[in-house]
């Protein structure tokens, strides 16, 4: 069951039905990069069903939020956290935020490096192991990785600071290398040797492993587990088509597509949140 209030649902439905949609005007979607595969398919199915096109821009959630807050043209904003869309709502720029999907963090590990959930922390702390993350604040994936480091202190005193200092923030920043077009940037960094272990979303780790034979996915042990709540908002003055698309994302059909790409429905726990 998708977590949103009755008032929000009724308001969105009312906006969606307020006037006939102009199929010639695409819905403008800004979404977290980790949603690219899932929401591309969602948008394709929505367009086939409704005749309404979706024009998508994917990137680091924080960077997209800053762009929208500065006046960038957007209608539907889907973030890898709740805080970024909530800040737009608090500023009076958008509708109440909907929690529409959940993810969790995993460790993407280079081939031949022996790691299990039980040995992951000790392995990340080794001097000869390169640790990669995304960029905190700009990209929620980086914030979630640093939440893992904070939890590590409860397992081994002082380890959190050590991990923060050694972690290379390789993705998600304004000047981060993008990697080959159409390929996993996380798998690329691991394949190129810039990281032996990369903390990233489990959904992204699956894509990286599929593209890079031999790369491993290691689940975080319960004491380090961090889940990711994904929030969506619709910008004020958006056309009815934008609300229709937002409703489609949280519909049974939209949620089935998200689940196919590894995302969990909001009612299902994906590890303790940050």
Where are these regions (language model features)?
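N-terminal signal peptide c-region/cleavage motif recognized by signal peptidases
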Residues: 16-19
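Bacterial N-terminal signal peptides that target proteins for export
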Residues: 1-9
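Exported/periplasmic ABC-transporter solute-binding proteins
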Residues: 23-72, 79-82, 86-90, 98-103, ...
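Cleavable N-terminal signal peptides
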Residues: 8-11, 21
